């Protein structure tokens, strides 16, 4: 009983620490360990299943996401210290469905400050998988650096038998610490596979191998704690950089879902509620109904609302549709952030169309 109480108190105190690594050196800021021969990697923790806690080791569904602090996660993987010096920053600790553009903007600005430090080799972000690809895409478009940025999550909570989080975290640090990872943009890493933030997406709500990059393919894989890349360093075709270093708020952009008999007035309602742009998750390769297109045309012509036509299918290509902006290869959730950043930069509808078309 007393052991349980002590464990609970330790766990509760750990969650309250804003910066969980406090071991310091006179020369090194706040790395948990320091070996001059190893690269420095900073881990920004956002929460999610990788930081999830359940009352049973067999429970993989009914658990509390974002319950374990970054110090506890790192302590579970002592081998990390063999590959890099680690500094941990607990940014937030929630399920990723609760994250907002404000949270992602804050994370981005923290990372911008970190990669500007000459002694920092790479960045790891621990994150819930539900919206992981959105944050990764945002970072890929806003952090202009050749330093490795790796976004990692897990499909089983930290308390589960055979939890995938510890190995995923170790692999993410290995990739962030490797010179082979330089110049590849933001990467997503789970289940031993390394993917581009631009083209990797979550495809299954439950399975460990949920993250896929169907058409573009993976960048590489982890073999025996070594990153093996299939190609020389490169970034996605048409990748655009947006400066958000002084941005305090992003414009609202809503996603509307296409289906038989959709209410065409939902688009107008979204704009009336404050949306500055829309992304349509259209049927097939971005099809939208005729009544719906009439409303969209009015919003574009009369109110200069930029509207991106994307696809609700798992993968594919959305070419030019009506008077809107085709998303080409981008799915709705990633196209939303690209549109938000474009509007924030003050680009016209034609400018935004050109930005989306660069990858084609």
From Swiss-Prot:
Domain Asparaginase/glutaminase: 39-359
EC number(s) given by UniProt: 3.5.1.1
Catalytic activity: L-asparagine + H2O = L-aspartate + NH4(+)
InterPro entries given in the database record: AsnASE_II, Asp/glu_Ase-like_sf, Asparaginase/glutaminase-like, Asparaginase_C, L-asparaginase_C, L-asparaginase_N, L-asparaginase_N_sf
Keywords: Cell wall, Glycoprotein, Hydrolase, Secreted, Signal
UniProt-annotated binding residues for substrate: 96, 129-130
Pfam families xref list: Asparaginase, Asparaginase_C
Example GO biological process: asparagine catabolic process
Active site, UniProt feature: 49 (o-isoaspartyl threonine intermediate)
Source species, domain of life: Eukaryota
Subcellular compartments: Secreted, Cell wall
Protein family: Belongs to the asparaginase 1 family.
PANTHER family: 60 KDA LYSOPHOSPHOLIPASE, L-ASPARAGINASE
Official protein name in the record: Probable L-asparaginase 1
Organism: Schizosaccharomyces pombe (strain 972 / ATCC 24843) (Fission yeast)
């Amino acid at each position: 009983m007393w052991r349980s109480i002590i464990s609970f108190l330790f766990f509760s105190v750990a969650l309250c620490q804003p910066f969980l690594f406090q071991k310091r050196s006179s020369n090194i800021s706040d790395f948990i360990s320091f070996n001059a021969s190893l690269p420095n990697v900073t881990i920004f923790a956002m929460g999610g299943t990788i930081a999830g806690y359940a009352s049973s080791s067999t429970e993989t569904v009914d658990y509390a996401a974002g319950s374990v602090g970054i110090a506890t996660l790192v302590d579970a993987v002592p081998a990390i210290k063999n590959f890099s010096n680690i500094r941990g920053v607990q940014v937030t600790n929630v399920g990723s469905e609760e994250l907002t553009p404000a949270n992602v903007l804050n994370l981005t600005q923290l990372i911008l400050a970190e990669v500007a430090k000459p002694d920092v080799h790479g960045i790891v972000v621990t994150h819930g998988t539900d919206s992981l690809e959105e944050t990764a895409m945002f970072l890929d478009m806003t952090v202009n650096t050749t330093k490795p940025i790796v976004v990692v999550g897990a499909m089983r909570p930290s308390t589960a038998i055979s939890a995938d989080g510890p190995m995923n975290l170790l692999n993410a640090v290995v990739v962030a610490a490797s010179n082979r990872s330089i110049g590849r943009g933001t990467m997503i890493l789970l289940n031993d596979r390394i993917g581009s933030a631009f083209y990797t997406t979550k495809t299954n709500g439950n399975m460990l191998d949920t993250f896929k990059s169907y058409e573009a393919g993976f960048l590489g894989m982890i073999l025996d704690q070594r990153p093996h890349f299939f190609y020389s360093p490169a970034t996605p075709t048409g990748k655009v950089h947006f400066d958000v270093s002084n941005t305090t708020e992003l414009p609202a952009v809503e996603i509307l879902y296409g289906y038989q008999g959709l209410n065409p007035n939902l688009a107008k309602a979204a704009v009336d509620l404050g949306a500055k742009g829309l992304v349509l998750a259209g049927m097939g390769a971005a099809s939208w109904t005729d009544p719906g297109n009439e409303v969209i045309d009015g919003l574009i012509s009369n109110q200069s609302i930029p509207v991106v036509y994307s696809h609700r299918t798992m993968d594919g290509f959305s070419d030019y549709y009506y008077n809107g902006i085709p998303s080409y290869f981008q799915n709705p959730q990633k196209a939303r952030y690209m549109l938000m950043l474009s509007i924030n930069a003050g680009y016209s509808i034609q400018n935004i169309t050109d930005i989306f078309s660069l990858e084609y």
